[in-house]
């Protein structure tokens, strides 16, 4: 375990009040791409996702379907697991907050919070958003009006749905005591919250003053019991945030669990949506400070997915009423799983809201995958079969006078690519791979292998060209592996490099000249058949 550095990446754990959707899939694919890159780059990766099963919202969803909360959450788990399997998600752990390990960890957290002095008992009287499981003060509440059909209503400032007035006995976490400590954290670690403008939002929120947080509920019972006060259950976010440490062995009294926690914690990267950034960048670090635990290194908040209106060009919120809602299966049906992953990771900027459209999906797929990457693989394999009996030419020696522009493009490509992947600049990382692919396609046109094949005196030059094309494919496949693991592995298999697909030394794999000469090359069907325009 400890022979490699640890890299721990997480998604949020997802509410089970409804099926997984495009947004949850987006968060999960981001984390998966990062996990796959880090495994290839030499890290021992733990990639965690899961389900957030407690809280009033889940209890209401269960009642609506005539089930107990546990029955409802059990019925939902297969939907999440099946979609992640379909989308080639490589998570190492799937945590459910109804598991015994989470109960033990949360109850251990309560005991430590009690010892810390940052916990007190009181009464909460204020506004609560059930869909968002969030408390709001009177000054934060949005007032309804005639224009939006909610005159006199108190609305959630985030989701704009009606709030409930809640009055109940509760335990409070002294969040207000951590204002200065949080601001110091942001000053000393300016990359704690990413992108930069999200850090500015978080800082501004904290500078405005923090209220103590109600962390137990007594008006319903679907939650983890507070161990020292019967009738209180844990506030859903106080429970949910701890899942990241639970999965590393927190709260388990064994040498093995303590070793795992020491190795894995703190997390390197939490991937979250911008709507839950305050929980992860304010409440979560304050909780950890209170119990004297290390803080995660980075929290990356991605934007929302919107739909580009084909007629107006405007970005619109997805909704069934507008008829513009897009489900994951809709995208899979159009692009396939690998095209789905590639589009969302390379054409949608993670840090900002991204307007998507089927038209743009087709454009990206055809331009990058069908016309460029897939075409390079097909043409190079076909020429290997035609001119070299289906084998890679011998690896060139250094005693030739031929220029090699592809080796020049590949020089230093790992470091450039890795820097961009580390910064979650997936479009930039993709551009490194596509630069090599485009250069290889231009190389075919410039070198004209078909003409070289007609001149026996230029046989060495032909072999040199075909070898370089296959070597460019090998390196590009490694760079695209985190985005499209199945087709990238297939590209490697077709040039007899299948053993490299599980490589954990990406830097070495990207060194020019790794392709062994004489190995079989297979043509195969097109990896990315061109899409015809939608009717």
Predicted segments — roles?
Residues 370, 374, 407, 411, ...:
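Generic structural concept
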């Amino acid at each position: 375990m400890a022979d490699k550095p640890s890299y721990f990446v997480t998604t949020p754990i997802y509410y089970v009040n409804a099926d997984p959707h495009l947004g949850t899939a987006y968060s999960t694919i981001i984390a998966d791409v990062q996990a796959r890159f880090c495994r290839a780059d030499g890290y021992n990766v733990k990639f965690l996702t899961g389900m957030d099963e407690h809280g009033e919202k889940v209890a209401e969803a269960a009642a609506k379907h005539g089930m107990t909360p546990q029955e409802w959450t059990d019925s939902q788990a297969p939907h999440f697991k099946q979609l992640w399997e379909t989308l080639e998600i490589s998570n190492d752990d799937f945590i459910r907050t109804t598991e015994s390990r989470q109960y033990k960890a949360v109850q251990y957290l309560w005991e430590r919070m009690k010892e810390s002095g940052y916990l007190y008992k009181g009464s909460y009287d204020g506004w609560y958003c059930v869909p968002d499981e969030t408390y709001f003060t009177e000054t934060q509440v949005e007032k309804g009006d005639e224009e939006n059909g909610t005159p006199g209503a108190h609305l959630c400032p985030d989701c704009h749905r009606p709030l409930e007035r809640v009055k109940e006995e509760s335990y409070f976490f002294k969040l207000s005591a951590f204002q200065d400590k949080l601001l110091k954290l942001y000053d000393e670690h300016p990359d704690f919250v990413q992108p930069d403008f999200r850090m500015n939002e978080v800082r501004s929120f904290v500078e405005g003053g923090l209220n103590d947080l109600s962390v137990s509920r007594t008006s319903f019972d679907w939650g983890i019991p507070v161990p020292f006060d019967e009738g209180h259950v844990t506030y859903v976010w106080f429970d949910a945030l701890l899942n990241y440490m639970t999965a590393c062995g927190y709260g388990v009294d064994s040498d093995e669990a303590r070793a795992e926690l020491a190795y894995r914690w703190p997390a390197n990267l939490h991937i979250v949506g911008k709507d839950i950034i305050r929980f992860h960048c304010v409440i979560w670090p304050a909780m950890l400070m209170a119990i004297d635990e290390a803080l995660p290194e980075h929290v990356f908040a991605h934007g929302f997915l919107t739909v580009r209106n084909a007629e107006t060009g405007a970005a619109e919120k997805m909704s069934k009423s507008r008829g513009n809602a897009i489900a994951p299966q809709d995208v899979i049906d159009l692009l396939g799983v690998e095209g789905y992953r590639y589009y969302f990771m390379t054409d949608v900027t993670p840090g900002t809201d991204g307007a998507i459209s089927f038209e743009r999906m087709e454009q990206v797929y055809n331009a990058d995958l069908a016309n460029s990457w897939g075409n390079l693989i097909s043409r190079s394999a076909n020429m290997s079969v035609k001119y070299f009996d289906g084998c890679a030419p011998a690896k060139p020696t250094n005693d030739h006078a031929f220029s090699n522009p592809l080796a020049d493009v590949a020089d230093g490509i790992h470091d450039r690519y890795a820097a961009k992947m580390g910064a979650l600049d997936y479009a930039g990382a993709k551009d490194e791979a596509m630069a090599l692919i485009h250069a290889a396609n231009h190389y075919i046109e410039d070198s004209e292998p078909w003409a070289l094949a007609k001149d026996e005196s230029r046989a060495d030059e032909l072999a040199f060209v075909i070898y370089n094309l296959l070597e460019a494919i090998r390196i590009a496949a490694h760079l695209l592996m985190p985005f499209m693991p199945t087709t990238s592995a297939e590209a490697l298999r077709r040039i007899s490099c299948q053993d490299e697909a599980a490589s954990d030394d990406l830097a070495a794999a990207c060194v020019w000249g790794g392709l062994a000469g004489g190995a079989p090359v297979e043509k195969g069907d097109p990896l990315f058949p061109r899409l015809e325009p939608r009717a």
